Amino acid sequence: MLEVFEKLVSSPTAAEQGFYVLITVIESLEYDEFEFYIPTIWAIVFGQPEKFRAEKFVKAFLLLISHFIVKHGSIKLVDSMNSVQANIFSLVVKQLWVPHLKLITGAIELKLVAVASTRIIHFLGECPAILDPANIELWGKMLDGIVTLLSWPEQDRVEEEQEMLYIAENVGNTPTFAHLYNAAKKEEDPLKDIKDPKEVLVASLAGLSSRFPGRYPQIINQYLDPANQAALLQLCNTYNCQII
């Protein structure tokens, strides 16, 4: 599997498909069954910086780490990435996650990424490091991205992208690739028990603010777009949640 993934990610035309192979692994196995390989996987990904200029690559990467979070938890994701390079997770959030959140499309994918992003800001919000000004800004901008994803119509936040599918000839025709890739591309909801990611978001924020009253309204006022502040307030009213 690791060999297939590395070949795909290194391919000039099929790089993002490597993430769909890994999604199958993440969804199928317990963490301790592939934990040993995780640092190598992240090292392979971060060793392809030029690939992150491609929107498809980044979106597939966000889907991968979102699957990771909802199946195995935020702490394991953060710790495993930072074991490869100190504080690289913060760079991932700042340079990749936040700018590309609004580009996620598809009902299942949107719910997955929104819930995973909510769990990340909840995790970060509970960390003492949130008091660092740089982390406060990161948290606020990520929340702004989540609200954009959940409240803006798709046509207002996503530029139309031409759909193109490439299969690397030296990888894509192997039985291993075909099985893993096709399994990952099935339209299966990994969060069947969650009906509304908007409710998940405001409930999480209400929980954080009840533990740390006075902290989050100031961050929201500073870092959320005014339209997103209004949208968040409307969501809080809809679900009867307060951010204090």
Predicted regions and their residues:
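Alpha-solenoid helical-repeat scaffold
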Residues: M1-I244
